[in-house]
């Protein structure tokens, strides 16, 4: 194999799938991580992939059409037959290359435990048995993002569609015990936006705006992929501080202003002149307009309401008492940092590789070796805090909401006031959305094959033989 290799790079995120080649900086395609299943008159099932194909199919509003996802809330595949069809669609329609021709690199989310061996085996089965890929590599997404930015230690905050994932990385190693996540992300905001705007966009005697239980899954997906996305990108904002604190501040300012006006009125009566009148500036009552194109209707909301949507990510208990305040983004980040500091002394034990070879743990198998873990296990928790908080990486599509980076800095500074904070967030919107794929692209372009953990079909066959022998031995015992 030569150093000037070309690989296929596929990133299956919870919302979108990105695919391309390692020798091209931009992906070949970005499609939804879902598909529409349609049954024709003959009873044959048709599977529709691709953004425009799915939008066109959903707009037809055909009875029986349903939208299905490929990955679960953890970002791991569960619909393997559909995943195979999606990859074949990518190879045949978008990449226009045979799977047998090029190596394959894919991403996998970080978890707070050892990767499920069953998940890894299904990946290898799909790659080697069904697609006949020559060699194959799985990279941990937040680790790839950190290394692609030149950071061996980082605190990766990924605010995506299915939720928020917080991953601390020390010396190129994911601190598995400190990986935390919440279910509050872009999809959660989609639902809240729909619930809030439904009464505003519903017209009298409009049969298309009936109760949600009568909507098809294709209708829900279509709305989330069109006008709701536009609403979130243009209307939503994150307040720099707690929204309740902001309201209290402006209320206090209004009270002070009222007292000043009362004093001026008394002076007016004594000095016989008219004081200037006006009102204090309260940005929360300013209006923002959104054009709802399906009905050509303008929707008007207070700025406070625009802040309120994003506030749910930091305080989910505002929606329901059933949601814990600990699942808010602020407590989640603090929990991850503290757990990383507490568990760093046992990291060396957590980074041992699986003797079977294919089931790798969240160790940086792509750079360095286990010698680097010895130094990381000797640092103090305070040093871990400082190392993480000076290398905060903010990524994910939902992190693009205006004001998100400033609010994250505020939340961390409240909980760790004695530490310096440094954040890194890609300011190019598209790059932020596909940063997981860009990280995998970097890992695919390492200068030497030996720096990456590549697996061949022979390795997979060896694993299967060893597993069968182990099962036979256990059965006889």
Swiss-Prot record:
Function as written in the Swiss-Prot or TrEMBL entry: Component of the chromatin structure remodeling complex (RSC), which is involved in transcription regulation and nucleosome positioning. RSC is responsible for the transfer of a histone octamer from a nucleosome core particle to naked DNA. The reaction requires ATP and involves an activated RSC-nucleosome intermediate. Remodeling reaction also involves DNA translocation, DNA twist and conformational change.
Family per record: Belongs to the actin family.
Effect of residue 411 to K: Impaired heterodimerization with ARP9. Temperature-sensitive phenotype. Moderate suppressor of Ty phenotype
Localisation: Nucleus
Coiled-coil region: none
The protein's name in its UniProt record: Actin-related protein 7
Additional free-text comment from the UniProt record: Present with 1360 molecules/cell in log phase SD medium.
InterPro entries on file: Actin (IPR004000), ATPase_NBD (IPR043129)
UniProt GO molecular function: chromatin binding; structural molecule activity
Xref: Pfam families: Actin
Source domain of life: Eukaryota
Outcome reported for the amino acid change (mutating residue 19 to P): Impaired heterodimerization with ARP9. Temperature-sensitive phenotype. Moderate suppressor of Ty phenotype
Main location: nucleus
Gene3D superfamilies: 3.30.420.40, Actin, Chain A, domain 4
Record's keyword annotation contains Transcription: yes
Quaternary structure and partners: Forms a heterodimer with ARP9. Interacts with NPL6. Component of the two forms of the RSC complex composed of at least either RSC1 or RSC2, and ARP7, ARP9, LDB7, NPL6, RSC3, RSC30, RSC4, RSC58, RSC6, RSC8, RSC9, SFH1, STH1, HTL1 and probably RTT102. The complexes interact with histone and histone variant components of centromeric chromatin. Component of the SWI/SNF global transcription activator complex.
Biological process, per Gene Ontology: chromatin organization; chromatin remodeling; nucleosome disassembly; positive regulation of transcription by RNA polymerase II; regulation of DNA-templated transcription; regulation of transcription by RNA polymerase II; transcription elongation by RNA polymerase II
CDD domains given in the database record: ASKHA_NBD_ScArp7-like (cd10212)
Entry's Gene Ontology cellular component terms: chromatin; NuA4 histone acetyltransferase complex; nucleus; RSC-type complex; SWI/SNF complex
